[in-house]
């Protein structure tokens, strides 16, 4: 028994020695053992003598998936007079749990949930007051609009309807960009619209009265900042802006802007128009903010046109409006006995109907309209 144990103990060292010898042999065959991973000291592998088989490129095109929007909170801020109807505003939060409203009655003598220090500067006083009072509790997105639901300066393809614009507005687009003018159509306001410090005889003074005072106002509002040679964005003082973008400017500056509005000798119309062409500079730093109309519609509202069809639509609409003008002129001059004029009116109306039919066909082919 003792001899067997002695043989076992003698065999263990021999076995260990054999294993060490074997690994030393392998090490000599495969290169030095790596004791640390210093990549720079590692020798480069020689190029393969036979090229590897390269997989064929996948030529199938996969369009990007739809943008997933998070449920951003939004507040619709409205400036209104007592007699203006804002029932359309009241109904919107009922359909959207992430939307609230703040309707400011600027000419009310009674206590109201939202009010302003003074009815001055049109919607500007409301917008600034809302930002000042809610600076630390803003929704993700603030939407600033006028009181009227249907108006000419709203978007054509949303039936000029403020409620439809709010419903279709894509929150992610505002969160990504910080600021969006709610009007997609460039005219009036873009491009090359207001030229501060121009001569008194300039056409700008006749057509854009705020051009005569905006240079002076700029110097008061932004002392030390050079006055841009031109200021442009689509009219008419309606926009959406993210909370992050608003807070890039200290609250104290908004207070100073409102103090300027309270103190300025400019009348309401002019002080409001001055700010109409300042908001975009304030929130984007761009003197001219004139996005491509089809991009605004598609990314801002989900209404996506073929650019050629978009241009064709407005070409046809221009022709239709010209004929409609002729009809109105003939109708104002015609008498019941004027058969020739009556026939001409009928002919023009028929052409107008045909053009409207073509416009409807384009709208029917456009993604997002009517949804």
Name every feature range the model reports, one short phrase each.
Residues 2-371:
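ER/Golgi luminal nucleotide-sugar-dependent glycosyltransferases, focusing on the catalytic module
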């Amino acid at each position: 028994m003792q001899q067997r144990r002695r043989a076992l103990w003698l065999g263990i060292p021999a076995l260990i020695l054999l294993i060490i010898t074997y690994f030393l042999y392998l090490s000599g065959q495969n290169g030095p053992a790596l004791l640390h991973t210093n990549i720079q000291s590692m020798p480069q592998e020689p190029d393969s003598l036979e090229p590897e088989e390269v997989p064929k490129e996948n030529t199938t095109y996969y369009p990007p998936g739809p943008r997933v929007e998070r449920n951003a909170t939004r507040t619709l801020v409205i400036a209104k007079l007592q007699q203006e109807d804002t029932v359309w505003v009241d109904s919107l939060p009922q359909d959207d749990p992430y939307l609230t409203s703040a309707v400011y009655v600027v000419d009310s003598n009674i206590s109201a949930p939202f009010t302003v220090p003074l009815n001055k500067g049109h919607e500007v006083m409301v917008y600034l007051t809302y930002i000042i009072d809610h600076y630390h509790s803003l929704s993700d997105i603030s939407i600033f609009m006028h009181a009227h639901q249907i108006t000419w300066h709203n978007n054509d393809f949303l039936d000029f309807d403020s409620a439809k614009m709010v419903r279709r507005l894509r929150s992610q687009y505002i969160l990504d960009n910080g600021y969006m003018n709610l009007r997609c159509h460039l005219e009036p306001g873009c491009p090359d619209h207001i030229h501060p410090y121009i001569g008194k005889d300039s056409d700008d003074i006749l057509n854009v009265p705020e051009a005569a005072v905006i240079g002076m106002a700029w110097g008061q509002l932004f002392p030390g900042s050079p006055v841009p040679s031109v200021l442009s964005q689509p009219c008419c003082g309606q926009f959406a802006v993210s909370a992050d973008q608003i807070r890039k400017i200290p609250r104290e500056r908004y207070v100073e802007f409102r103090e300027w509005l309270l103190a300025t000798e400019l009348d309401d119309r002019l002080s409001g128009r001055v700010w109409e062409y300042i908001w975009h500079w304030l929130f984007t730093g761009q003197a001219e903010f004139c996005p491509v109309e089809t991009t605004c519609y598609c990314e801002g509202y989900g209404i996506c046109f073929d650019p050629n069809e978009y241009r064709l639509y407005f070409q046809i609409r221009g022709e239709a409006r010209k004929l409609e003008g002729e009809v109105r002129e003939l109708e104002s001059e015609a008498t019941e006995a004027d058969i020739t004029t009556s026939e001409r009116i009928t002919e023009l109306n028929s052409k107008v109907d045909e053009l409207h039919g073509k416009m409807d066909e384009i709208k029917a082919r456009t993604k997002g309209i009517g949804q």
